[in-house]
C-alpha cells in the first residue's frame, strides 16, 4: 500500500475506556488538495479531520494516528451509542459525489488493503461495525453514496452484504433497524432511516418505503449478525 504521512493538528486523546470498534467510511465531496487543506486546517472555528484520506489513485494519506480521536463523525449513533468519534477510525475517500461518480478500481483496491489493516489492529471492528457516514447519521449525511461498492468490500471480508433469496422480515421495521444498529426514530423519521438502510444495502431504489425486498434484506442481515428484532 502506498502511503504518505501528512499530520493534521485536529485530534484529541481517546477516552481511557474507549475501545476502537467502529470503522466509518466517508466521501470527501472535494478534490484531494481541498480535502487535505480542510482536514489539516487548525485555524477553523469548527475543525475537522480523519485518520486517513484515500486519493483516487490509491495513495493513502495518514493524518491522525489511530490511537487519537479524529473529528469526522459529528452527531452520530450506532448500536445504541452516540458520539462515535471516541470509538471509531475514519477514512475519507476522495470522490466529489458518491451518488454520481464511480469509485476507481485502484482506489477500492487500496481501500480494501487499508481496511484490512485497520480491522487487523482493532479486531473489535466486527463486520456490522463497518459503516458509512449515512448509516450513523441518517438524513444528515449521504456518504459514501449509492455508487460505493459495499458488495465488493463484503466479498473481501469487510462489512456486511445481504444474501439473495431471504424471506421478508415479519415484524416492526423500526425495531429491526435498531437491532442492526441504526438510531431510533427520535428527530429522524422512520422513512429516513429506511432510506439510509437502502442507500447502503439496496442502492438501486432509495425511496424510504419498507417494501418486501427491503424487509427481506433487513431480515437476512439480522440473521447474519445473530440479532432478533
List each model region and its residues.
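Active-site-adjacent loop/helix surface patches within enzyme catalytic domains
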Residues: 1-128
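Cell-envelope/ECM-targeting effectors and their regulatory/trafficking segments
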Residues: 74-76, 105-124, 128, 137-229
Amino acid at each position: 500500500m502506498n502511503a504518505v504521512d501528512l499530520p493534521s493538528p485536529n485530534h484529541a486523546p481517546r477516552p481511557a475506556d474507549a475501545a476502537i470498534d467502529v470503522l466509518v467510511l466517508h466521501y470527501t465531496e472535494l478534490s484531494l488538495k481541498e480535502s487535505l487543506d480542510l482536514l489539516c486546517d487548525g485555524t477553523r472555528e469548527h475543525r475537522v479531520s480523519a485518520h486517513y484520506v484515500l486519493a483516487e489513485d490509491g495513495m493513502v494519506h495518514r493524518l491522525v494516528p489511530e490511537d487519537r480521536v479524529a473529528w469526522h463523525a459529528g452527531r452520530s449513533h450506532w448500536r445504541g451509542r452516540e458520539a462515535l468519534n471516541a470509538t471509531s477510525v475514519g477514512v475519507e475517500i476522495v470522490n466529489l459525489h458518491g451518488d454520481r461518480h464511480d469509485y476507481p478500481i485502484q482506489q477500492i483496491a487500496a481501500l480494501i488493503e487499508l481496511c484490512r489493516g485497520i480491522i487487523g489492529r482493532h479486531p473489535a471492528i466486527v463486520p456490522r461495525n463497518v459503516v458509512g457516514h449515512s448509516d450513523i447519521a441518517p438524513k444528515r449525511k449521504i456518504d459514501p453514496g449509492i455508487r460505493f461498492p459495499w458488495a465488493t468490500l463484503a466479498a473481501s471480508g469487510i462489512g456486511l452484504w445481504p444474501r439473495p433469496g431471504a424471506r421478508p422480515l415479519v415484524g416492526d421495521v423500526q425495531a429491526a433497524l435498531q437491532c442492526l444498529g441504526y438510531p431510533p426514530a427520535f428527530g429522524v423519521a422512520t422513512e429516513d432511516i429506511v432510506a439510509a438502510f437502502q442507500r447502503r444495502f439496496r442502492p438501486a431504489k432509495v425511496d424510504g418505503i419498507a417494501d418486501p425486498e427491503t424487509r427481506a434484506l433487513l431480515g437476512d442481515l439480522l440473521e447474519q449478525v445473530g440479532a432478533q428484532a
